[in-house]
Design a protein with these regions (language model features):
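An alpha-helical interface "stripe"
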Residues: 1-148
Length: 148
């Protein structure tokens, strides 16, 4: 079994990560990714997402409300409907109330118009547990701290 895992890493995972690096994704070592996620129960690179939300949504998202936006993203259920909701966040279709304008405004999570404004990370051996079940992805891609 050890050969199979070693072979999979050598023939699939490593080449995929290497290619991602070649096209501009920054590699994050597994141990560093675990710290950025705040442990195996974390789904996001919290600090990265926090910084990008504030940067991409000037005046709408601030240090005062960024945690609430992240809580909303983290609260999305792991279902087909939840996947659609996360896609809505990625596409900028989810909104929050803008007190200064007295209206809902869409939140930008990914800047599609200017890709250089985004942060692209790739990591491997992403193990996640919710306390009852554990799941592991060989390779994980994140844009602005959010797994895609």
């Amino acid at each position: 079994m050890g050969n199979k895992i070693g072979s999979e890493y050598r023939t699939v995972q490593y080449p995929l990560i290497r290619y991602a690096e070649e096209v501009g994704w920054a590699r994050v070592l597994t141990s560093e990714a675990l710290l950025l996620r705040k442990g195996e129960g974390g789904l996001l690179f919290n600090r990265v997402l926090e910084e990008k939300l504030i940067e991409l949504n000037p005046g709408l998202i601030t240090a005062d409300n960024v945690d609430e936006v992240i809580r909303r993203i983290e609260a999305v259920r792991n279902t087909i409907e939840g996947n659609a909701e996360i896609l809505g966040w990625l596409r900028g279709e989810q909104s929050i109330y803008d007190e200064s304008e007295k209206r809902e405004r869409n939140v930008t999570v990914v800047d599609f118009a200017t890709p250089d404004h985004n942060v692209f990370h790739v990591t491997d051996e992403w193990q996640y547990t919710n306390g009852q079940e554990t799941n592991r992805a060989d390779v994980m891609f994140l844009i602005n701290g959010l797994p895609v």
